[in-house]
Amino acid sequence: GKNEGVTFIGTNNKNGAELAANFICDKTPKGADVAILTGMESQSTALLRRDGAIKGLKACGLNIVATQTAEWDTAKARSVTESILVKNPNIKAIFGSNDNMALGAIQALEDAGMNDVVVVGFDATPDAATSILAGKLTATIAQFSYNMGAYGVKYALALANGEKIDANIDTGTQLVTTKNANDFK
């Protein structure tokens, strides 16, 4: 719900997922089959990332054949991806709403001998950065926890000084690929 007078300072998860989707669109032929692994459906972060991915993937003409929860978990993502691959053997890309799920998807793809599928995660964990540099994970989306703290202090001081601040303050996201993955190890 809406809380009057409360400000959210953090990642715009929908925009971050759209950034991931746009990258997938650039790397995947129009009309190709793609899948989305979501977090827990009861959590706003999962829903926002799912919705952002759907918006971005549909906008460029990709065919979303599966949108399934793996509850942020690597082992569940591996199992869910295995099931998706049985029904959709021509899958060309997978968006994992966090890096754990993206890495689980990679395990399932490797088991199936499919190493040409674009896989993008979210969070830019050190394991994800290592996987990108190893040529497995294609990309991930970074969010900036430092900004969350710094902006929190900045805007708390602004409020204390009687200033008005926005209800939502985005702390930023960034695409992480082989070009910048070393910065996130």
Show which residues each predicted segment covers.
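A residue-level marker of the well-folded mature domains of exported/periplasmic proteins
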Residues: G1-K185
